[in-house]
Amino acid sequence: MSSVLVRFAPSPTGRLHLGNARVAVLNWLFAHAHGGAMVLRLDDTDIARGTAEFAQAIRDDLLWLGLTWTREESQLARAARHAEAVDQLKAAGRLYACYETPEELEYRRRRQRAQGLPPIYDRAGLALSAAERAALEAEGRKPHWRFRLDHEETSWLDLARGPCHAHGGHLSDPVLVREDGSLLYTLPSVVDDIDFAISHVIRGEDHVVNTAVQIQICRALGAEPPHYAHLPLVLTAEGGGLSKRDNALSLGDLRAQGIEPAAINALLAALGTAEAPDPLKSLDELAQGFRLDAFGRAAPRLDPADLVRLSARIYHALSPSEARARGIAVSDALWLALRANLTTLSDLDELLPVVEGEITPLIAEEDRAMIDEAARLLPETPWDATTWATWTAAVKTATGRKGKGLFMPLRRALTGVDHGPELAALLPLIGRDKALARLRGEKA
């Protein structure tokens, strides 16, 4: 494959959610699977809603995921170049002025539907004479400009969907320039893809309908189009669409909840394929063997609970040295005792006091005699990983307690909770003095 250059083109009108983060991840993986690179293109022409803060948040979120780009571009800063493309298309006779109001266009569409016809623009603007255009402008009307599609078959090999085609005669000539002179998304996107030498455009299948139009615009500007791949859109677990308004699935909120970026990358890379997500793989490892044709045609559903589960797998596999590198200031033995019980790192706030702080023991009245006997039988130090089994065997013999009736009261007395890390590993870390005090019902 020739040199691969992809682009991720978010609009800085909100935080990244998992849907557009997936586009970024898949573009990066595809590029790096083929020795290529990614361009970050901010589609920042929506001045009313776009902010510099959102743009920076997008950069921060991408870097948090580990995604890199070789260059960053702003569409707004390229307005002069886009205007040149408008002039080029006008000069070639591919842009023509139209003067209908939105109400007039809607009326025509209703009539077409009532007649059983597709609501396709009838090219009335193309038939206007210079005198008719002048008369309309004298009324105060300003033109919007449509791209004249060739009424022919446009075909492309979609790298995710296979062979695709659309006939220009079945499509409305798209508006590229509004009445106020501002450009719709379509033309700047094509111009930027040409100028940046983008080789592959990987995006959601909601853009499939635009592809034939963009290919024709690209060729009208004297360039060959990039390769395209359109993937099914991700749905929520309930079957709804993802949105910037769904804050629970924004990268910023997921980060605040303690979700690991590697968990997000793994899930987004596997979503829609037959592969199980592996959060222990790096981005480079995920890129190895990455294939667009591995994705199915059905819209995958994304359950945030999967991210929690995958994040937990990362913590469970984290070595003491890796934990220290993350700034987790606990001993090796304590980390090994606690990690299997972590869902997010914030769980440490509840677990650490069991060893390093004070807890209030929970001792039910019906367990008091058994706990007193356990305190009497508590072994002398030194303690090791076998102390728990030796001690509980002695308590079992002395009290007749076994199973849950033996272990649950001891856990409540020693930790103040009903569940947690294995006490065989935890008991030596708690220490004899603190354990004895808790068995006596003292806060320690």
Swiss-Prot record:
The terms under GO molecular function for this entry are: ATP binding; glutamate-tRNA ligase activity; tRNA binding
One of the GO biological process terms: glutamyl-tRNA aminoacylation
Instruction: Indicate which residues form the motif 'HIGH' region.
Output: 10-20
The protein's organism comes out as Rhodospirillum rubrum (strain ATCC 11170 / ATH 1.1.1 / DSM 467 / LMG 4362 / NCIMB 8255 / S1)
Where does this one sit in the cell?
A: Cytoplasm
Read off the PROSITE patterns from this record. AA_TRNA_LIGASE_I (PS00178)
Q: Which reactions appear under catalytic activity for this entry?
A: tRNA(Glu) + L-glutamate + ATP = L-glutamyl-tRNA(Glu) + AMP + diphosphate
Q: What is this protein called?
A: Glutamate--tRNA ligase 1
What keywords are assigned to this protein?
Answer: Aminoacyl-tRNA synthetase, ATP-binding, Cytoplasm, Ligase, Nucleotide-binding, Protein biosynthesis
